[in-house]
Amino acid sequence: MVEYYDVLGVQRNSSPDDIKKAYRRLALKWHPDKNPDNKEEAERRFKEVAEAYEVLSDSKKRDIYDKYGKEGLAGGGGGGGSHYDVPFQFGFTFRSPDDVFREFFGGRDPFSFDLFAEDPFDDFFGRRGHRGNRSRPGGGSFLSTFGGFPAFGPSFSPFDSGFSSSFGSFGGHGGFTSFSSSSFGGSGMGNVRSVSTSTKIVNGRRVTTKRIVENGQERVEVEEDGQLKSLTINGKEQLLRLDNK
């Protein structure tokens, strides 16, 4: 039988933060899209890691698991307990590991920033992400889990700040594409600012398009490797100064 603490490589007295860090590391390591040559094992490990995180990240489920084992979560009351000792008498159904992954990362593609950073969450705490259906056309585009999200709409994240959304996908030979959007409401009516950003990495170059709409004015900036290449305000292209970076 799978032992959830062993799956995540943590101790029984590990803190919730330790559980989150362990899941983050192992989910990124065993994501099936990252292991095309070892997909069968990756899918099994990815599922086990998601199950372990679902249980150990929830204090009530973790307490039941510690007392009764996995049978307790199914309402069976293992480990010497009785069925009626278990609060979850109707059983607990595990979600899809993809859903757990999407929710944990708030809909944002964890591979769009430094995958090997000590704590990639440092890059997007407080961000808000959309959840969507996983789509893997043509045998599976890399991390297309994050494709198909609307620019704005209902969203959910464990680290919800209530103003932004983001997602991304890898598209075959076209390079990685990521999108993010933010909307800020001011104190008065009409004082609204929205920002949407699209980033493409094509042939080793990062091309970022930022669209800012504020008080009826639209500003579109296009940067290549951090250097501003074009600026358009309300559909009219602006002359750039040579010292623009």
UniProtKB/Swiss-Prot annotation:
Listed GO cellular component terms? nucleus; perinuclear region of cytoplasm
SUPFAM superfamilies linked? Chaperone J-domain
* Domain spans labelled J: 3-69
Q: Which GO terms describe its molecular function?
A: Hsp70 protein binding; unfolded protein binding
Q: State the source organism's domain of life.
A: Eukaryota
**One Pfam family here:** DnaJ
- Fill in the subunit field for this protein: Homooligomer.
* Name this polypeptide is given: DnaJ homolog subfamily B member 6-B
Q: Which organism is it from?
A: Xenopus laevis (African clawed frog)
